[in-house]
Structures are given as C-alpha cells and as structure tokens.
Amino acid sequence: MNHKTILVTGASRGIGKAIALTYAKNGWDVVITCLRREEELKKTQREIEALGVSCLAWMGDAGDFESCSRLFDAIRERFGSLDVLVNNAGISYIGLFQDMTPDEWNHILNTNLTSVFNCCRLAVPMMVSHKSGRILNISSVWGVCGASCEVAYSATKGGINAMTRALAKELAPSSIQVNAIACGAIDTEMNQFLDEEERNALLEEIPAGRMGRAEEVGKLAYQLGSEDSYLTGQIIQLDGGWI
C-alpha cells in the first residue's frame, strides 16, 4: 500500500501530536518534529508506529533553514515526497511589550513565522512538481483580533494568516490548497499557566462554555488535508464562538 505522507512541526505534544495521531489512525505515514522535548517526541513516535504506519521523528529547529533542508532531504529519501504540510511549531510570550527584548522578539518570530516560511519554501517545489498538496497553518484568533500582553505572538499569527491567503492564491493553479486554523482557547499545556479564577473567567467568555480539545483540532486538520476541496486561502476559526 502506498501511504500518503504528512509533516507536522511541533508535534511532541498538544495540538501537533493530536494532528499527527489523527492522520496515523487513518493510515498516513507521519513525519514529526520538535526542538527540545526529545523523550516526548520519541513517545509520540512509538504511539504512531503502534498504529501500523511509518514515522520519522526529527529533532531540530524549524526556524533554521539549513536545519529544515536536512529534514526535507530525509523526507525525500524515506518517503519520496510529501502530501500534506502542517505548520504547527510555535511558542508564546506573555508580558508587556515595553519589557520585551529584541532577542525575545526575534526568537518568537523565528519559531512561529520564519519556520512557516522555511517549511513552505522547501515543501512547495515538491508539491508543485506533482500538481498536488495541502498546506495547513495552525494560527490563533489572536492573529485576527490581537491580544494585550501578547503583541509578538499576535503579530506572528497575523503574519501567518496573511501568508496563508497570499500563498493560496499563488499555488491554486498548481492544485495546492493552503488554509489556516485560527484556534481559540485549546486545553493544552500552553494554557496551563491559567489559575482557576482566570480559567473560569475565560470560560464565561466562550459561548460554548468550555475550552476546545486538541483532538478537535486534529479532526478539522484531517478534514482539510485529506479531502479534495475548492476551499483555499481561508482562516477557519475554531473557537467555540469566542471571537
């Protein structure tokens, strides 16, 4: 059986892991990446391989182009090509903008936005050559409306949204769809800093009355990446009606 192949960046846990497992459960070979959490990445790899598909786990910096180039060399060698790219790698910075250092700004920009450029730049020629492919960028509602004390994070997600729309237009003639999921409050480790009072206040703002689950992002990501569709260039908000 010729399995299709997906690359998910930032897949050691949370949303990235949920997306990777969803595709694996549907018979896809999976490439997963992480920068620092090697043991968690290996655990995810074992879970994926237990589903009967092949999994390449790669430790490296998606924000570094040369590092990404080595990753894509490994993908070509092992799988031949790539059918779906999910740009999920990301970090947050919470604090006053006036206290942010240039190094902190550059770090979040490289991790959240430059990584998307790097992976898209390397994946697009592969997809164009086959006149087929899907690119899915994991964004945030803060990229739509902005968030106080998360200026840099909001800026990177807004950049991802703009890049999604522009790249979708450029790649549509090659039958490649590019979309983004703008997540609201998803119940992952990234939101574990909230204390009980803050969490309850947040839930009161969400019409659905709860935070989203990583598995729900995985389900939507699978639908967008696995089905033939006229849908491209869209920023799909998955936020329980919050924003």
Language model segments and positions:
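Conserved glycine-rich Rossmann-like NAD(P)H-binding loop of the short-chain dehydrogenase/reductase
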Residues: N26-K43
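Conserved glycine-rich cofactor-binding loop
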Residues: S12-R13
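Substrate-binding pocket helix/loop in short-chain dehydrogenase/reductase
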Residues: L96-F97, E104-L109, E198, L202
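Alpha-helical segment proximal to the catalytic Tyr-Lys
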Residues: P125, K169-P173
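Active-site helix of classical SDR
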Residues: C120, T156, T164
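C-terminal substrate-recognition "lid" of short-chain dehydrogenase/reductases
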Residues: S132, I176, R210-L238
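Residue(s) in the substrate-gating loop at a strand-loop-helix junction
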Residues: S140
